[in-house]
Each structure stands twice: as structure tokens, then as C-alpha cells.
Design a protein with these regions (language model features):
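Basic- and aromatic-enriched surface patches that contact anionic nucleotides/nucleic acids
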Residues: 2-22, 26-37, 47-173
Length: 173
């Protein structure tokens, strides 16, 4: 029988992602992850989905500290206290790019910006209230406490490679 992984479903505000990153607790570049592959158009479309309330897939993370606390010892000491992103790197990177001023979105999408007439804005162009409103958007997370990078990779591969790209058809139908 396959062991159940027991991922916990949570909703967290976007600000938690920034907090984890700024504290050095967010691991976006695990060995099984690809690099940053989303272009500007895809990033903007994702942000529009997020801001308009379209459900987006949950981000899958591994709470390595929780795994270590439960007796897992297969992580290097420097990595034992991090949240490793198993699935959702492109989404979280896009959010952080916006917050950090590296991605601009149409100004008409936001009510609270420092320049009311700005055609394009990033998180650094929002007022304190505007940034708080954005940062309080909730995102779904699936949180695991897997004991090793190998188990993280297994989940990553099941989520990303077990299906077909849209438009493809299985040959064994």
C-alpha cells in the first residue's frame, strides 16, 4: 500500500511569502526545479487571475523544519529550517517581482497608488494601503513535511510530469 503524504491545505496571505523570503526561509531554487521560465505576458496574466479572484492551483511547499522536528535528518543543516517550494516557483517569483518593483501591471488595476495617473505600476508604486491590500490576498498552499529532497523531487515529478500537456492525447486509450 502506498503511504499517504498528508499534505495540509492552508490559505496564507501573500505577505507570508515575502516574509519567508526576507527571513531567508524560502527555498525557490531546489535541484529539481527549473529556472525562471515565465515571460512577461504569462506573469501579467497570472497576476490578473490572482487579483480578480480566479482560483489558482495551490503552491506545494515542504516545511523542512517540521520534517526535521519529526525526526527527518536528510537535509543539510543550512536547509533544515526552510520552506522548499515543490510546485509554484513561477507563481511565487512573479508575486515577489511585483512586490519588489521588477514587474509592472496596468495602473487601472489598482486604486491605491502613489501616482493616480500612472499607466503601469509595481508594488513599489502602491501606497501603504495599496500594498497592504495586495499583500493580504490569500493563496492556497499544500504543505508537506517530507523527510528528504528525494521525496520532494518525487512529488514535483508527479505533479508536473504525470499528466499531458494540453492538446496532447495518450497513445494507449
Amino acid at each position: 500500500m502506498l503511504p499517504r503524504l498528508n499534505l495540509q491545505q492552508t490559505n496564507r496571505p501573500i505577505d507570508v511569502v515575502r516574509h519567508w523570503r526576507d527571513a531567508g526561509d524560502l527555498e525557490l531554487n531546489t535541484p529539481y526545479q527549473r529556472g525562471d521560465v515565465w515571460g512577461k505576458a504569462r506573469r501579467i496574466a497570472f497576476m490578473k487571475s490572482l487579483l480578480t479572484g480566479i482560483p489558482i492551483p495551490s503552491v506545494i511547499i515542504n516545511d523542512r523544519f517540521g520534517a526535521t522536528d519529526r525526526g527527518a535528518t536528510q537535509f543539510a543543516e543550512a536547509d533544515q529550517y526552510k520552506y522548499a517550494v515543490i510546485d509554484g516557483k513561477q507563481r511565487l517569483t512573479t508575486i515577489l517581482m511585483f512586490v519588489d518593483g521588477e514587474l509592472q501591471l496596468p495602473g487601472e488595476w489598482f486604486d491605491h497608488k502613489t501616482d493616480p495617473d500612472a499607466a503601469m505600476v509595481s508594488g513599489t508604486d502602491l501606497t501603504h494601503v495599496g500594498l497592504r491590500l495586495f499583500s493580504n490576498h490569500a493563496m492556497g498552499f499544500s504543505e508537506a513535511t517530507l523527510p528528504s529532497i528525494e521525496r520532494e523531487r518525487e512529488v514535483f515529478e508527479l505533479v508536473n510530469f504525470a499528466g499531458l500537456q494540453q492538446g496532447q492525447v495518450d497513445t494507449d486509450i
